[in-house]
Amino acid sequence: MAKNLILWLVIAVVLMSVFQSFGPSESNGRKVDYSTFLQEVNQDQVREARINGREINVTKKDSNRYTTYIPINDPKLLDNLLTKNVKVVGEPPEEPSLLASIFISWFPMLLLIGVWIFFMRQMQGGGGKGAMSFGKSKARMLTEDQIKTTFADVAGCDEAKEEVAELVEYLREPSRFQKLGGKIPKGVLMVGPPGTGKTLLAKAIAGEAKVPFFTISGSDFVEMFVGVGASRVRDMFEQAKKAAPCIIFIDEIDAVGRQRGAGLGGGHDEREQTLNQMLVEMDGFEGNEGIIVIAATNRPDVLDPALLRPGRFDRQVVVGLPDVRGREQILKVHMRRVPLATDIDAAIIARGTPGFSGADLANLVNEAALFAARGNKRVVSMVEFEKAKDKIMMGAERRSMVMTEAQKESTAYHEAGHAIIGRLVPEHDPVHKVTIIPRGRALGVTFFLPEGDAISASRQKLESQISTLYGGRLAEEIIYGVEHVSTGASNDIKVATNLARNMVTQWGFSEKLGPLLYAEEEGEVFLGRSVAKAKHMSDETARIIDQEVKALIERNYNRARQILTDNMDILHAMKDALMKYETIDAPQIDDLMARREVRPPAGWEDPNGTNNSDSNGTPQAPRPVDEPRTPNPGNTMSEQLGDK
């Protein structure tokens, strides 16, 4: 930045100097008015007058000099000078040199070209690239000394590491494979959700193999000029051939690898020409021995079939969400850089974070460290990890948001309705936490934490989720009446309706329609799908689908109403606990559902200075009472969040 500033300052100074040199030269001596000059001529004090246009350089008889200018054309001036015996010398007007004339005439054009080059360099990222280097590859090469990542830094995806381990062996000892006539896959496509470690795994391959590593994003190929994408692909593979054996890593390849001939661009756009060139380079007339192309995407369904055939991306490696053992390994990797308390158990944290990706777990460790730093602690304990988990799962607390007592009470009944239904319907995830502290965009949150990694869901579980989603709205309706039900259940209704429609149209849970697929194809144009949508059902079938969805929701809605009606005492008690503690966890919910006295949450401080402890400071044993009334097991399911 400093070098560019100095360069532009030097250019500005040079231009100013050039323009000053082209300007009229300054006359020597002082300047006097024209009337004084005429008086001195009449008084015979002038010896010589040099006339150059309107400028007169005067030399007096006492050798003093000055300059004056003729304001208007004076035809009598020459006669007057000759009469007084003044030596008159005529000088031709100054004309610019040929070089100056050329410069002045071409300067505007040169200035425009210079500005255009400047902006093109900025668009190309500046640096040492020329203004016309659009076709040069933007791939960045990392040498083996720059890549410090190894397989030891990658955890939670053992199967994926095994899949790519032979790539490392080939890059280390290619002769061992070539002797037996074996060919290593030319391309490996890593597929998986965001944040699962696809890019990290590619870097680990390069770090283990100790070979040059070219990295580029799929969006770096295509820009504003036609032909740039294909040119960059050619240049990238030319660089890779010089550095072979090497690895080319293309992140988010779906940016250029989408299916051809579909979408709004028809079959002839710049992206498709880039893809065509990539297909040729990967497996065309000329081979690329020693070059392994690794690509990553979370949308393999939109890629062109020619890109996925053997000879190009021979192998697809699925990098999925880690299981509980994988999450434990990932947490241990990220915990290396954090000072931990003695109570930290990565296995417990892993069991409490189902569905977390590697990036989510890294964020969890970082958030826990930040919580510890805010509390001026020297180590990170389980308390900070619990706070970090709640923040990631439910959103940050908004304690500054002012709520009236009536709003807090309505929110407490709403969240209590979710929790009670979720606790009493079969096959539902356990209630982890209920809070009426605003988090994120929600006024309150009821969070259900699965006991394990969910692979599939039964019909009963799905219907239980629908009942739980309507628990909040039903609690408001029972307590306040239909006229005073709030809009807080809008997201619950949306999730429940989509869930019921999927059960009917995709998962075959309708006796009337049977196990058939009725859902329409949902592909956006920009993802390489067709613009037109095909309708796969008649109007009569669509009407039956709507009836089945409504019947499914009404059945679970009525079941949830009956559960709350039978357990009104628990609903009121949970509301009171939420109004007092604001947040309750599983132990408090257990007490409420068993109709016992509620123990205070861990770390809760009574503003009145009293608590539920004996003289030794330990909580008193809860008082057992009757069990809640549960309905007969029926068909049932529930969403993770019931937000107010």
Curated annotation (Swiss-Prot):
Chain ranges passing through the membrane: 5-25, 99-119
Matches recorded under Pfam families: AAA, AAA_lid_3, FtsH_ext, Peptidase_M41
Active site positions: E415
Cofactor note: Binds 1 zinc ion per subunit.
SUPFAM superfamilies associated with the record: FtsH protease domain-like, P-loop containing nucleoside triphosphate hydrolases
Residues where Zn(2+) binds: H414, H418, D492
Cofactor(s) it depends on: Zn(2+)
GO molecular function annotation: ATP binding; ATP hydrolysis activity; ATP-dependent peptidase activity; metalloendopeptidase activity; zinc ion binding
Binding site for ATP: G192, P193, P194, G195, T196, G197, K198, T199
UniProt-listed Enzyme Commission number(s): 3.4.24.-
Enzyme class, broadest EC rank: hydrolase
Periplasmic side: 26-98
Quaternary state and interactors: Homohexamer.
Family listed: In the central section; belongs to the AAA ATPase family. In the C-terminal section; belongs to the peptidase M41 family.
Name of this protein: ATP-dependent zinc metalloprotease FtsH
Annotated organism of origin: Salmonella typhimurium (strain LT2 / SGSC1412 / ATCC 700720)
Name of encoding gene: ftsH
